Every structure is written in structure tokens, then in C-alpha cells.
């Protein structure tokens, strides 16, 4: 099964991705993990990403997409994968479609975790991370609304909307049930 996870920061994508990965026996591919792995291994893509990050800039789509492409070519992703953090923009979604088309593949579903902004703020503040203050969180939500939310329309027809305001177990169960239909 080939899946993409969408949802605002704090929706629980990382938590749900791990549970889904285990339940479906497919790798959880997170762009954050890809960046860290490529940087720690000193790959060419990792060096490029590090330069942008050191300068406080966003890593360009091309670098991120190339990391994702390389990861999707690994053996454990042959029977499916769960993408978390990519695509984040329409441009990245187009690139992902091209990557899959080259292999005669397509996404099975796009899971969209829906959660209110107030719940997101509450969750993220309770995590106690240094960079999680209300102003920063609301800025991240604004970026999500502008950049990533348009993907919901892009993937219309493949979207599975999941209410992400319950318990971890309930959300996981709802996701697996939606995928079974």
C-alpha cells in the first residue's frame, strides 16, 4: 500500500505513521528522518541540505525530492510506503506523481488528519519543546494553511479524512478502518 499522510503540525502524523507502518508492514518515510540520515551519512544530498539549513533557509524541493526518490528505490519500499512530510506543496505532489508514474505506480490513498487549531496549540504546548510557543505554533499553522492545505483539493477522490481529536488508539483504528473500505 502506498500512502501519504497530511494534516497540520501537531495532528499526530508521526505517532500514527509509526502505528500504521507496523500494522501494514510498510516503511514510514519521514522527510525529517531522511534529512538526518543523509546528513549523518555525509551523502551529497545531505551536504546540500546541510548548507541550506546552516544558512537558515528551507531545503529546496529538488534536494528533498531526490532524497525521497532514493528512499523509494530501496528494497523495503517495493511493496508500499507511508510518506510523512512529503509532499508539502503542489509542486512536490507533481514530482511525486512523476516518480511513481516512472515505475507504473500510483498512490493508494492520502490520509488527512483533521484537527482544530486550538487542539493543535494545546497539544504542541504540552509537548514542552523549546521552539513550541503559541506564536511560533500559529505561524506554522498559517504556513500549513497556505502551502500544504491546497493538497487536499489536489488529491480529491483519494483523500480519507480522519478526525484526529480522539485517543491515539481511536485515531489508529479509524485510519485502518478507512483504509479497509
Swiss-Prot record:
Domain comment (free text): Consists of three domains, a large central CORE domain and two small peripheral domains, NMPbind and LID, which undergo movements during catalysis. The LID domain closes over the site of phosphoryl transfer upon ATP binding. Assembling and dissambling the active center during each catalytic cycle provides an effective means to prevent ATP hydrolysis.
Gene3D superfamilies membership: P-loop containing nucleotide triphosphate hydrolases (3.40.50.300)
One Gene Ontology cellular component annotation held by this UniProt entry: cytoplasm
PROSITE patterns xref list: ADENYLATE_KINASE
Localization of this protein: Cytoplasm
The entry's keywords: ATP-binding, Cytoplasm, Kinase, Nucleotide biosynthesis, Nucleotide-binding, Transferase
InterPro entries for this protein: Adenyl_kin_sub, Adenylat/UMP-CMP_kin, Adenylat_kinase_CS, P-loop_NTPase
Residues that bind ATP: 10-15, 127, 166
Pathway the protein takes part in: Purine metabolism; AMP biosynthesis via salvage pathway; AMP from ADP: step 1/1
The keyword Cytoplasm is annotated on this UniProt entry: yes
Keyword Kinase carried by entry: yes
Protein name listed in UniProt: Adenylate kinase
EC number: 2.7.4.3
GO MF annotation: an example: ATP binding
Similarity field: Belongs to the adenylate kinase family.
Domain of life according to the entry: Bacteria
A Pfam family of this chain: ADK
Entry binding sites for AMP: 31, 36, 57-59, 85-88, 92, 129, 140
Organism: Corynebacterium urealyticum (strain ATCC 43042 / DSM 7109)
Amino acid at each position: 500500500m502506498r500512502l501519504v499522510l497530511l494534516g497540520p503540525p501537531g495532528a499526530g502524523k508521526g505517532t500514527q505513521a509509526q502505528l500504521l507502518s507496523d500494522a501494514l508492514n510498510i516503511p514510514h518515510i519521514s522527510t525529517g528522518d531522511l534529512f538526518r540520515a543523509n546528513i549523518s551519512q555525509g551523502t551529497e544530498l545531505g551536504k546540500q541540505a546541510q548548507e541550506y539549513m546552516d544558512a537558515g533557509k528551507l531545503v529546496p524541493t529538488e534536494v528533498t525530492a531526490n532524497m525521497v526518490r532514493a528512499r523509494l528505490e530501496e528494497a523495503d519500499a517495493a511493496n508500499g510506503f507511508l510518506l510523512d512530510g512529503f509532499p508539502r506543496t503542489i509542486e512536490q505532489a507533481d514530482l511525486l506523481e512523476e516518480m511513481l508514474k516512472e515505475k507504473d505506480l500510483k498512490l493508494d490513498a492520502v490520509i488527512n488528519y483533521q484537527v482544530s487549531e486550538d487542539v493543535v496549540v494545546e497539544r504542541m504546548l504540552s509537548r514542552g519543546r523549546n521552539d513550541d510557543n503559541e506564536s511560533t505554533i500559529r505561524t506554522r499553522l498559517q504556513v500549513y494553511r497556505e502551502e500544504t492545505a491546497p493538497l487536499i483539493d489536489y488529491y480529491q477522490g483519494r483523500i480519507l479524512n480522519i478526525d484526529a481529536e480522539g485517543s491515539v488508539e481511536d485515531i489508529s483504528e479509524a485510519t485502518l478502518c478507512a483504509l479497509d473500505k
